[in-house]
Amino acid sequence: MFYPLPRKIQLAPSTSNWSIESTHSILLIVGLNELENAPDWMNQPLADHLEMLSKRAQALEIPVMMIQSSQLQQVMLQLGQQLSSNTQAQVIIAGNLSPLFKQVMQLVLSITDYVAVVNDAILAGSLEQHIQWIEKISFDSIQHINTQTLMRLWSLSAPSAQVLSDKGILLAVAEQVGRHPMEIHPEIDLRNYGLDAVGVNYLVELWRANGASLSAEELMQTPTLQHIMQLLKH
């Protein structure tokens, strides 16, 4: 069922390159329940990519909608309302490349041209079909993008006031330690929750890009949520 995800060089270049903005994005994940029930799902890079996308979206308060066939009508009604109330909405789609995925995509394309597929967060019947389908959507001028680039664009386009708010700081930290925000005590060392050097560097880069003056060394002097919030308020 699973196959090695294609490398960038194997995929047709994206012919549509409108700017992705976190404030306009809506993430659709199609058929995740089917994928999660497949043997060996937890060891797949695809599982990691979908989880990373979902966590980054939640950290930046981007709506995430899970779509499965049993709730299709209800979810599409909800999505239709969101798209009609926001003419700048951008729909980012990932998940199981099934007939349901293609049906959802056609419905969305009938409402907006701002549709992008996450090209390393979908599962086709085979690697060859995956590559061919990305080539087809490129030919149809539908944007495709990989997980890392999308997450970077989301973070870079998020409003500074949101990123540096107490809620924004909490959500970013929660994403990096893989916990629900309510689980993080403000005075407990974040290393106890699993914060590592990679997570620290990401957070420092994110906050500096939004105007904060902060170094990894300063953050690690007292790596608690409370201390970080105080540092970022200066």
Show which residues each predicted segment covers.
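Active-site-adjacent betaalpha module
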Residues: 1-26, 68-161
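Short acidic, Gly/Ser-rich segments with clustered Asp/Glu that frequently serve as metal-coordination loops
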Residues: 32-42
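Anion (oxyanion) recognition and catalysis
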Residues: 51, 55-59, 108-113, 138, ...
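AMP-binding/adenylate-forming catalytic domain of the ANL superfamily
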Residues: 212-230
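Von Willebrand factor
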Residues: 42-44, 49-70
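Thiotemplate assembly-line natural product biosynthesis machinery
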Residues: 159-183, 202-209, 230-233
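Phosphopantetheine-attachment site and its flanking helix in carrier
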Residues: 188-211, 227
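Phosphopantetheine carrier-protein modules
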Residues: 174-193, 210-218
